[in-house]
Regions:
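Non-cysteine beta-strand/loop elements that form the S-adenosyl-L-methionine
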Residues: 1-2
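Conserved active-site-proximal phosphate/metal-binding subdomains
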Residues: 5-32, 38-182
Length: 182
């Protein structure tokens, strides 16, 4: 995953504009781009950088069929690319999450404890919170993964509508906008 991703981006902070071409240079097997992917522009860019396709996490959460609480979908729709935070860095288990009161508590603990922090110190904000958030809609229960791509999510289509739109956008980009570069 590129640094933009929701969830665990690794510890080296490498965005997809660097990571994907490096992967294309180094790998001898097909790979998909992941992190910051939302639309036809993402797909065309991923293909141009050597990926065979793209993986979308945060974007697919905001679809009609996604089996998560409506509060999660609405929180992502209301968010911008500036509303995520990186947590658990001192533990070298960095996770990108959507800001909420539980995340603010976690960040306060990280700031106060610094390098002395232990998982047990933040367990209330991370351990077992996913069912509370994703199933019950308790948006302040703690940290939950969300990518910076939230800033590019404006609607809640069906999966079919989303995939069709992505393919149509990619086709238009390639056949109209990019044709003049050849």
């Amino acid at each position: 995953d590129g640094f933009e991703c929701g969830g665990h981006p690794g510890e080296d902070d490498i965005p997809n504009f660097i990571l994907l071409p490096r992967a294309a240079d180094e790998l001898t097997i097909p790979f998909v781009a992941s992190g910051g992917m939302a639309d036809g522009r993402s797909l065309v860019a991923a293909l141009a950088m050597g990926a065979e396709g793209m993986n979308m996490g945060t974007r697919f959460i905001v679809t009609e069929e996604a089996p998560v609480h409506e509060n999660v979908k609405q929180a992502i729709l209301a968010a911008s690319e500036l509303d995520t935070r990186l947590v658990m860095r001192p533990l070298r288990n960095t996770e990108r999450v959507l800001i909420n009161p539980g995340v603010e508590r976690l960040l306060e603990k990280e700031a106060a404890l610094g390098s002395d922090i232990k998982f047990e110190d933040i367990a209330p904000e991370v351990a077992g919170v996913y069912p509370k958030i994703m199933k019950n809609g308790d948006m302040d229960a703690g940290a939950w993964s969300c990518g910076m791509v939230a800033g590019l999510i404006y609607d809640k289509p069906t999966v079919q509508e989303l995939v069709d739109r992505i393919m149509s956008e990619a086709d238009s980009l390639i056949s109209e906008r990019l044709k003049n570069f050849l």
